[in-house]
């Protein structure tokens, strides 16, 4: 495989995010890179793909900048680009928590745990493990025994914690996410909220999955990623499928977006059921006039109506 996917972030000061984004985009395009990078006054958060030569040049370029000289890159081999385009965008935050009183992880964040230390936390009955990702990420793969917050956006996590605070009373709290960036801010927020013993998996699931000592122990399923790959394997020793098909509950790791553009819900579904249910999550979405699956597959009105009857068995409409 001649391509690499880079995942990285750093909380630091960027004085002029707009100018930085403009210059950085030009550099990335000149090196034929594709991906998504967010920059703000609080730092940089990026994931991009390119050939090994191009991504190595990018990392060397970043490390030559005093501001990014110690930035850690998580690297995955790939068969091709993981993105279709290259975007570098200035933002208010590099990860959106939307707090009234923002948290600066450079000053307030949970204790960092190495993969080995995190594995010990997983084995400790007095430690609560909180998955700081969205529910659809959790449903594809997670650490055994972790708590699944019922959220679809990171910014909703603080409210969910407040509503379920009784679950964590007098416990040590350890949190984890994909690459570590969400936990940096989230664990700092937990400390501000009065949780006294807070820690985080340093480098996230991506780092744990490559650790030679832990060998991905206690991880089940796949890790969701925000690029064209959708998911990657983490546990190289014991592979399990924990995802369940939206319609029949059978083991499934295939994500699609609901074909109704006004819904766009992510669901796990087999190719067979995607065909059967017109790429939609519900009867209402399947019959929507702008159903993308119907349009893309040139399905006739008669066939459309026929497949809608498949929902009768699901009792999803009156």
UniProtKB/Swiss-Prot annotation:
Reactions listed under catalytic activity: uridine(34) in tRNA + AH2 + O2 = 5-hydroxyuridine(34) in tRNA + A + H2O
Keyword entries, A-Z: Oxidoreductase, tRNA processing
Similarity remark: Belongs to the TrhO family.
Entry's EC annotation: 1.14.-.-
NCBIfam families: PRK00142.1-3
Disulfide bonds: none
Annotated gene: trhO
Its biological purpose: Catalyzes oxygen-dependent 5-hydroxyuridine (ho5U) modification at position 34 in tRNAs.
Rhodanese domain span: 123-217
This protein's name: tRNA uridine(34) hydroxylase
One Pfam family matching this protein: UPF0176_N
Molecular function per GO: oxidoreductase activity, acting on paired donors, with incorporation or reduction of molecular oxygen
List of catalytic residues: 177 (cysteine persulfide intermediate)
InterPro entries registered for this protein in UniProt: Rhodanese-like_dom (IPR001763), Rhodanese-like_dom_sf (IPR036873), Rhodanese_C (IPR022111), TrhO (IPR020936), TRHO_N (IPR040503)
GO process annotations (BP): tRNA modification
């Amino acid at each position: 495989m001649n391509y690499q996917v880079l995942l990285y972030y750093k909380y630091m000061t960027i004085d002029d995010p707009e100018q930085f984004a403009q210059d950085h985009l030009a550099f990335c395009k000149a090196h034929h890179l594709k991906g998504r990078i967010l920059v703000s006054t609080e730092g940089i958060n990026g994931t991009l793909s390119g050939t090994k030569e191009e991504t190595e040049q990018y990392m060397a370029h970043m490390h030559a900048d005093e501001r990014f000289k110690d930035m850690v890159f998580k690297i995955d081999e790939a068969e091709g680009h993981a993105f279709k385009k290259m975007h570098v965008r200035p933002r208010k935050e590099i990860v959106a928590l939307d707090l009234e009183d923002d948290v600066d992880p450079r000053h307030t964040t949970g204790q960092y745990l190495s993969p080995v230390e995190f594995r010990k936390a997983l084995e400790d009955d007095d430690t609560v493990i909180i998955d700081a990702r969205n529910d659809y990420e959790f449903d594809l793969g997670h650490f055994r025994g972790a708590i699944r917050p019922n959220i679809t956006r990171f910014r909703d996590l603080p409210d969910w914690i407040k509503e379920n605070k009784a679950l964590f009373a007098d416990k040590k709290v350890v949190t984890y996410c994909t690459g570590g960036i969400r936990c940096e801010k989230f664990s700092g927020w937990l400390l501000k909220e009065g949780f006294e013993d807070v820690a985080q998996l340093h480098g996230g699931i991506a780092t744990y999955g490559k650790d030679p000592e832990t060998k991905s122990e206690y991880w089940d399923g796949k890790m969701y990623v925000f690029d064209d790959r959708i998911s990657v394997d983490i546990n190289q020793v014991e592979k399990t499928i924990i995802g369940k098909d939206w319609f029949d509950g059978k083991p499934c790791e295939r994500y699609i977006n609901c074909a109704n553009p006004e819904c766009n819900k992510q669901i796990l579904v087999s190719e067979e059921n995607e065909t059967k249910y017109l790429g939609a999550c519900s009867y209402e979405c399947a019959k929507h006039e702008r159903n993308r699956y119907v349009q893309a597959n040139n399905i006739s009105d008669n066939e459309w109506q026929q497949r809608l009857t498949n929902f009768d068995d699901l009792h999803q409409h009156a």
